[in-house]
Regions:
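Non-cytosolic beta-sheet module surface loops
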Residues: 40-42, 128
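Aromatic-lined carbohydrate-binding surfaces of glycoside hydrolases
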Residues: 84, 96, 110, 121-123, ...
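Short, solvent-exposed loop/linker segments at the N-terminal edge
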Residues: 26-32
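Hydrophobic residues positioned within well-ordered beta-strands of beta-sheet architectures
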Residues: 36, 47, 105-107, 122, ...
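Surface-exposed binding patches on compact interaction domains or structured appendages
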Residues: 2-20, 33, 43-108, 115
Length: 258
């Protein structure tokens, strides 16, 4: 089995030719994730990565989507990279099968928080189906530690139809898991939009929890909506201003240092 290393400055599209590199050199701070793009030039169903000692490695798949040609001629009809999906989730949802004779993937390596500054040689072993390949990565660790709080602020929505559970407790558990996943990848949530009923006390508790979390660069409250027929659209989603007024009043009356 072979693994071809791609330059991180190159965006590989299905069908493009590519240089086949073997040397891998990365740089990052303690606690940071560094990454490289690679290709397994044969069909495979699943792939995982392991690293030496305290170094952690993780693989993401680059999933493709087929686009039609645009009327402007900017895009041709072909398959383009769409999103990256981590290997464990891809396997769970049967979303990691390569049908193109090659597989584009990203390998992430986490630099330990206590790693010594300087140059390290880390052995990475990638397993795909029944085959294995090992590569050595030269990783230069900078002499500082990445802060817990990050500046990568993102906005994402969580809908009831995304979390398949009618039980409120299970819904909240899965909701919290999604929030933690964003924080794990240094994406600080700014808008959480769960459908369903959030009590005022529950919203206050959640806000206190997130504003006290040093990993969160920003956070905003969930809000409540309802469906209403308007002159613009049937079943349009509208902001529940009465709920919002009660929520903001509760915050004003229960302010904290955070």
């Amino acid at each position: 089995m072979e693994l071809y290393i791609l330059s991180n400055t190159v965006k590989h599209r299905f069908g493009d030719s590519f240089g086949r590199g073997t040397r891998l050199s990365l740089v990052g701070a303690r606690g940071e994730r560094v990454a490289f793009q690679a290709i397994l030039p044969k069909p495979f169903h699943n792939a995982f990565a392991e690293a030496d000692g305290e170094w952690d490695a993780e693989i993401f798949w680059e999933r493709y989507v087929k686009l039609s040609a645009s009327s402007s001629g900017v895009t041709a009809e072909r398959e383009y990279p769409d999103v990256m999906v981590d290997a464990s989730r891809a396997e769970k949802f049967k979303d990691n099968t390569s049908e193109r004779g090659e597989g584009v993937l990203w390998c992430f390596v986490t630099i330990p928080a206590d790693a010594a500054a300087g140059r390290h040689t880390v052995r990475l072993e990638v397993t795909a189906d029944e085959g294995k390949v090992a590569v050595e990565a030269e990783i230069e660790v900078l002499d500082f530690c990445l802060p817990e709080q990050n500046g990568n602020v993102t906005s994402f929505a969580i809908r009831e139809d995304m979390i398949k559970s009618a039980d409120p407790g299970e819904f909240r558990k899965k909701y919290d898991e999604l929030v933690e996943e964003h924080l794990h990848y240094r994406l600080s949530p700014t808008k959480l939009l769960p459908y369903g009923t959030w009590g005022i006390e529950e919203a206050l508790s959640e806000a206190r929890k997130r504003t006290a979390d040093v990993r969160c660069a920003a956070y905003s409250l969930p809000y409540k909506t309802f469906r209403e027929d308007t002159i613009y659209e049937k079943g349009q989603e509208c902001l529940d201003t009465d709920y919002l007024r009660k929520l903001l009043t509760a915050f004003a009356e229960n302010s904290t240092d955070e």
